[in-house]
Amino acid sequence: MNYSQFLNMIPEATLMAVLLITFIADFCSSKSADRKWFNPLVCLLMVAHIAINIFPTEATSAFGGMYTSGPAAGVLKTVLALGTLIVLIQAKEWLSRKDTAFKEGEFYMLVLSTLLGMNMMVSANHFLLFFLGLEMASVPMACLVAFDKYRHNSAEAGAKFILTATFSSGVMSYGISLLYAACGTLYFDDVAKVITASPLTIAGMVFFFSGLGFKISLVPFHFWTADSYQGAPTTVTGYLSVVSKGAAAFTLCAILMKVFQPMVEYWTVLLYIVIVLSITIANLFAIRQSDLKRFMAFSSISQAGYIMLAVIGNSTLSITSLTYYVLIYVVANLSVFAIISSVEEHNGGTVQMDSYNGFYKTNPRLAFLMTLALFSLGGIPPFAGMFSKFFVFMAAVHGADIHTTLGAWAYGVVFIALVNTVISLYYYLLIVKAMFIKHSDSPLPTFQSACSTKLALAICTVGIVAFGICSFVFDWISVAANA
């Protein structure tokens, strides 16, 4: 084996180094001792990992072309690493509990293992490597969902996640087998050269799309989402809702545009249907929720629909707008989950929306930060979420212009998405109304979040404001996508 190939996998190599150092630090230190240094160590290692890989590099390959990584994939990996860093920072408050402190090392290693699997997914140029990366991400993620194993809800959520992940992997592997039967190869480049629209390849594409649809929580593959999000530890829910979803969405976009380009009219129709169903059904269900984590679950399903809008463009603008949307979604969504987690830790695990009535009077700063994040998720200017939605709409309209037979349909999908944006503003404002206007006889008491949570919220808030104002962020992504 030529080990020099690992030099072409710098993001994965540095991440494996972070994982190895974390394992050694956990193994060599006493779990009964006070390990306040452990979380800062892991976070500093992640900062170093991001700093090494933040600038796009030239296209590289390894393992006979099964692994390929270009500037666009490198930028997406940096975005995923940033989201992971924020999760690790805000997890410190939750991991300080007696029932989780002794598992702190396991949590970090599971999170880093899922990120490594996602990186392999993003850089895969072969269906086998893609599937291995997907399973590398899914198995540790199932452990994370069931991390609070002594809580009934967490164990139940883990079981549901495992069953759903197993089923979706089976569906996807069946689709891959059909594609192999039709094309005789599993390399993305070679499949793209020989694939034609036939009943066998269309079936393979649909099964493959369905398998990834489960990972992204697209309707009608979303049934596991609300229960798993509700039962998982809140920090894990935040990680699952942004980092995992972002990696799967980017990979689906890249494969559709690269491998299934000769069948563009077939998967475009499939996308239209899934986008409309995801945005509309998720919005209608979100309005009815009383549990804040279930509310955010349906919000994430709706956001997945908006992310998929970018794919309609079928161009480098699609990659650019999708990556930018994922970046903004990471900071906005993790900001909300950081506040929910902090409230849980200080107020007996409450996640009911009614509990936030009068939240502004007792915790004005957290209420203000929650409002900023919700406004960004809703696409209210001048926050970054407005620009991210604008760019995915622009990509979708670009797709409508280039499709000769399906252009009118694309405009219809964009119109439906715009209408649903107004609906989403309504249910995001329900939380704002509860915090600022509604009265409660027993409001949440005033409390101080941990320093780690404050740091995570500071990073997210700066991102929500600055990423929309500073054009160089979008330019950085655009240059990488067009390289």
Where are these regions (language model features)?
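Alpha-helical transmembrane segments of multi-pass membrane proteins predominantly involved
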Residues: 1-483
